[in-house]
Amino acid sequence: MADETTVSTPAASGTETPSTGGGGAPQGRPQGGPRGDRGPRPGGSGRDGGRKFFRRKKVCKFCVEKIDAIDYKDVRLLGQFVAESGKIVPRRLTGVCTPHQRRLSDAIKQARNIALLPFASAR
């Protein structure tokens, strides 16, 4: 155990590679970071290295337009927040704030109960 540099006998396959004893990088690969010697990606300072995509922060439509009451009879407005499958679209997709999302879902449910909005899509 004192001598780590032992000479090994040739393997049955005929090819022999010296082992470093550790779990380091393979012999043929260059050392360095995840990109090796290539350097940074060209382009902007985005997460993915230059993708030209800017996502606007979603704002609540009801807060911007100063709509206080969400009317259950306004089918055109409520229909914007209902998917084709009939599900209420979540606020992370629409950008509606929490208090307005609660009022919106109550108005959609009320409109469904009096048959102004369908519960599910008509296939």
Curated annotation (Swiss-Prot):
Keywords carried by this UniProt record: Ribonucleoprotein, Ribosomal protein, RNA-binding, rRNA-binding
UniProt xrefs under Pfam families: Ribosomal_S18
Residue ranges with Polar residues bias: 1-10
Molecular-function GO terms, alphabetical: small ribosomal subunit rRNA binding; structural constituent of ribosome
Domain of life: Bacteria
One GO location term (cellular component): cytosolic small ribosomal subunit
Compositional bias per record (Gly residues), positions renumbered to this chain: 20-34
BP GO terms, sorted: translation
Region annotated Disordered, chain positions: 1-52
SUPFAM superfamilies: Ribosomal protein S18 (SSF46911)
Task performed by this protein: Binds as a heterodimer with protein bS6 to the central domain of the 16S rRNA, where it helps stabilize the platform of the 30S subunit.
NCBIfam families: S18 (TIGR00165)
Family recorded in the similarity comment: Belongs to the bacterial ribosomal protein bS18 family.
Oligomeric and partner information: Part of the 30S ribosomal subunit. Forms a tight heterodimer with protein bS6.
Name under which the protein is recorded: Small ribosomal subunit protein bS18
Organism: Koribacter versatilis (strain Ellin345)
Lineage: Bacteria, Pseudomonadati, Acidobacteriota, Terriglobia, Terriglobales
Gene that this sequence comes from: rpsR
